[in-house]
Amino acid sequence: MLLASKTKAFYGLQGEQIYGAAEQVKEEIPTGEGALAETFALKKDTEDGQDGVAEKKESDGEDRGKAEVRDKTEVRDKKEGKEQTEAGKGTEEKQEEAEAKQSAEAKQGSDAKQDTTKGKEENGNFETDAEGNLQIKKADKAENVAGEQIGSLYLNGESAYELFYFSEKAVRAHASLLNTVQAMFPKVKLSAMIVPNSFGVILDPKVQEKLASSGMDQAIAYSYSLMDKRVNTVNVFDALSAHKKEYIYFRTDHHWTQLGAYYAYQEYCKSMGYSTKPLSDYQKLDFPEFYGTFYFFMNRPESLKGHPDQVTAYQGSMNTMQYTDSKGNLQEGKLINYASQMLPGNKYNCFMLGDHGYVEIHNEGAPRKKSILVLKDSYGNAFVPLLAQDYRDVYVVDYRHYQGNASSLIQEKGIEEILFLNNIMGIGESLSQKMLAVFQ
């Protein structure tokens, strides 16, 4: 998994390690604003049984060819299979889960692939401690480890990072998705939040350049320039960069901390003209000894082993939710959960008990008498509990697990706002089709 010395020398690095990477050809990010990304004009199923076909058009309505959109049922049937993270043209981690009640060993690997690679959708959970063996087994949703694909990883001392490489196809596809949904619901306020990872925000730009990486801030700005001007684009890169010396990302895991999510929430509210509660209004809960996805993927490096993360959660007065379980039944749960007894690899699940296809939160005392739909990946788990303090009705869809129809949900619930919250490594061509499928 560790790169050969000649590849390491190619990057011009000393004393660092790169995992699961291949020599990358840097794709330049276009300067200035690009032309608006094409939209998908959705069609009903054809009479000959070929479902899910869409015509690809420019925003002004001119035909620009056709693109296939996966049949929604087929997409959902693949939940036990794979999940893609292609925006960074990173490599993929493949894990084969062996089910056993007593123990199971994880076989991990990675392939260097381009934008359209398929990753893994995680349905098991990590069970381990700093000394123990990594085990993956089926578990309740309360113990699931939320995770996106881990691509090329870079280890520098006590911190690990996931490398980012720009892909024109990936960001344009994501912009097309947002433009399509805006066209479908012209009266709904639509927002896009592309969340940078720790590599783009924390790591020295000079080191990024040595790794032949692309400018993440430029990539996000370019993606936003391709979106319909009605879409509210939220610049969280600058907001997070202003706090880069604070604990806004985990060092052993690919997620942000809830402190990072709070700064992003502040920026979202600012873009919408809303006020936010200070952190002093929340109850602070600390859960030490957290080892995240980077730690396990890198086979427990000593530099990370001796410096575990701490999960800090901010619990507001609204702390209840309803979520669908694996059988589609609506269950009661908490937005912030006590994680001290969770296994070291599971403690990010203190936020919303991990990933669920559908969540409802109702807060009659909220200052905003509005309803919002959040379409998210696992970065949203730390974000939604903050949002829930301020909105009367919050509906959350995780496109990787959702079994319903988001278009029907918007109409039935009278949803007024939609927020797409996706981390930078979780956007791309096929993922955009998968997100679009939940609206059909």
Task: Write out the residue ranges for each language-model feature.
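Extracellular glycan-modifying ectodomains
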Residues: 1-440
